[in-house]
Regions:
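Acetyl-CoA-dependent GNAT
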Residues: 1-64, 69, 82, 88, ...
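Short, conserved glycine- and acidic-residue-centered signature motifs
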Residues: 18, 78, 108
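Residues that form or flank phosphate/diphosphate-binding pockets in enzymes
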Residues: 58, 76, 110
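Conserved acetyl-CoA-binding loop-helix of GNAT-fold acetyltransferases
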Residues: 65-68, 74-87, 91, 113, ...
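Conserved beta-strand-loop-alpha-helix junction that forms the acyl-donor binding cleft
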Residues: 73, 96-111, 129-132
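Short acidic/polar active-site loop segments enriched in Thr and Asp
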Residues: 95, 121
Length: 132
């Protein structure tokens, strides 16, 4: 995962911060009955990831940390990760998937294009959702 962060630094032209939840995926996702997936290449290297956290006392969940290695974007990896997360949500009684998009919009333009292609609609500024 650290390697992926370093590659993100090169692609973004700035050093991304490590979100605390990524430092202990087991405690922050798996032990909470949430989920986190990694996309692995043929050399067993992480090339992408996505996380999902339930919203307490609802049938909704938030997606987090969708990341694809920059040199592997537009090869369907992000779509496969998203489809995997959405399938898990459906199988676990989650009816609505939500995602928070970063700002400024120009910096996160890929997210603002990616999610609508997969049926997500904006319901508040910087937030999108999809009924599963």
């Amino acid at each position: 995962m650290i390697f992926a962060v370093l590659q993100a630094k090169d692609a973004l032209g700035r050093k991304p911060t490590i979100n605390p939840d990524l430092l202990d995926i087991k405690a922050n996702y798996l032990d909470c009955n949430d989920m986190f997936w990694l996309a692995i290449d043929e050399n067993d290297r992480v090339v992408g990831c996505i996380g999902c956290s339930r919203i307490t006392d609802t049938d909704q969940a938030f997606l987090h940390r969708l990341y694809i290695k920059p040199s592997l974007k537009r090869k369907g990896i992000g779509s496969k990760l998203l489809n995997t997360a959405e399938l898990w949500m459906r199988e676990n009684g989650i009816a609505v998937s939500k995602v928070h998009l970063g700002t400024p919009k120009e910096q996160w333009f890929e997210s603002y294009v990616f999610y609508p292609k997969h049926g997500y609609i904006e319901y508040e500024p910087r937030y999108m959702m999809k009924v599963l």
